[in-house]
Amino acid sequence: MKPGINEKNGKPEASRPKVRIMAILLALFVILASLPFLVPHTGLLSLFCLVPLLCMEHIGTENGVKRMWLWHYSAFVLWNAATTFWVCNATVGGGIFAILANAFQMSLIFGTFRWSRRVLKGILPYIFLAFLWIAWEHWYLTSAQISWPWLVLGNSFARTASLVQWYEFTGALGGSLWIWSCNLGLFGLMMWAATGKIAQAGRVALVSLPLMYILLLTALPVYSLLRYKAKDTEPDSTLDVIVLQPNIDPYHKFEALTQSQQNALLLKEFDAALAEEGYDSTGITLALAPETFTGGIVNGNIEETSITWRQFKAYLQDKPGMNLLFGASTYDYTFSKNAPSYNARKCRDGSWVEYHNSAIIMDRSGETETYHKSKLVVGVEMMPYPAFFSKIDNMLGGVIGRCVGQDEVSLLNCVQRDSLGRITGRIPVGCAICYESVYPEHCTEYVRKGAELLTVITNDAWWGDTPGYRQHLSYSSLRAIETGRYIVRCANTGISAIINPRGDILEETEWWKPAHIVSKAGLEDRKTFFVTYGDITGRICSLMAIMILMSVAVRAFVARRQQKQA
């Protein structure tokens, strides 16, 4: 074999200049892919961000670069680190694991793509790559127990909501498909020119192919802008809302104030907000406090176990139309010989306790409705595959979170009562708790069950002043478009906001400052296409990816068998 020839594939090994070009392309990918998640109104960069990565892969393959998986993995690690480094502020180990594990899955997709090129030719491997990537995102959003869908490509447009009004039909994965289509289209045109095929093309191809690509780039944004202007932003009915941002440092929550003192301070701020804005609290009003505002509540025995419930009930006695929705840490105790579930922990008195991250709504009657968060953060709140990991966790002394979530979503009802305590009105409200607002189809479940308004209660203080809380806020804009609902967002340290069905942030608070919003939120009863039919894009791409993968596997098996026989 001649020097400089790769012994495995017979192709010339890459020279140093080409390796440098690959490094530049890797860096360019990281920059272009990261900016939409870090800088407002840069979502359009995602339509070109994958081209450097595809070029890097092409150069590496053509020049026999060894360990291409390491190039892919490095690119994805850097992208994940640049956009989600802030997770380390809450948990260093969890943050590093999220970055490395997410990047590993992304590089595994590219590894499968490279394997498919052994039997697929032309554009088919690239089509398979796009389908496989979106299938993975769909799996992350719907089925995976270890799930971190923060960097779904369609989320790139979260701060460019006017360009993706069509998410009401496709959801965020429609954005992922558009991004892949535009990137592959540009990459194809570049390869067409670089290989000299452009000289062999006829006039029709020379004109039609670039025009088709321009149409692919512009058709959806043009439609979206027209749809954005045409959308009716005046709802038929509204609900008065009060959003309170207490700005309590969760790392020092009980060092300065007891829970009773925090409750009193919250209620005082509610009164100040009402007085400042001149609102009449006898009308139906929804007041919100953030995620895990209080704790120590035993489900089924809230009257005896919660000072918060007693203080809130006393406060609401002269406010017949006010409903208070707040986050709470709640518990279920069971006295039995065996654990009621893998997530239960044993207490000293022999009972078993199960933890919940909950949202509770109540009015002056003291009656409550509770929803337990069902999309839980892996490690911190939820133990994946508990039949296996519970044994490991027990050996480690219980370091993994074991919150128990609901099997399906339920609604909280904002009620209005007359002077005799009779219910005269009821408004169904969906409440996504923190991380749940990242999941499109999860949020559509509230609307399918009849929610006329969506709320998000969250903490968002764990990450510090980083891009994390801004990204989290922006994803609520996408959920508003997908569901066609107003979203009222209450965050402990910011940013709290009111968002309309176009994804516009109508009002918002500042970060790390006590604040309140007194406003009106629209009530809607129509269902978008995405709510009615779900994530069709994700399901179709998953089906196509499975079919192509099976075809590749069969063809690879047959080819290998023929080689052995030869």
Residue ranges and their predicted role:
Residues V87-N89, G93, L141-A172, S341-T444:
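Active-site catalytic loop in hydrolytic enzyme cores
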Residues S34-F37, G111, V243, A359-I361, ...:
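Conserved hydrophobic/aromatic beta-strand scaffold that supports enzyme active sites
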Residues I109, F113, F270-L274, V409, ...:
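Generic structural signal for well-ordered alpha-helices
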Residues F37-L54, W79, Q245-P246, S281-G300, ...:
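Short, conserved active-site loops that position catalytic residues or coordinate cofactors/metal ions
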Residues A130, L286, T294, I302-Y333, ...:
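CN hydrolase (nitrilase-like) catalytic-core segments centered on the catalytic cysteine
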Residues S224-G379, L411-G425, C431, Y435:
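Soluble catalytic regions of membrane-associated enzymes that act on cell-envelope
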Residues K2-K229, D465, R479-A480, L506, ...:
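Membrane-embedded alpha-helical bundles of multi-pass enzymes
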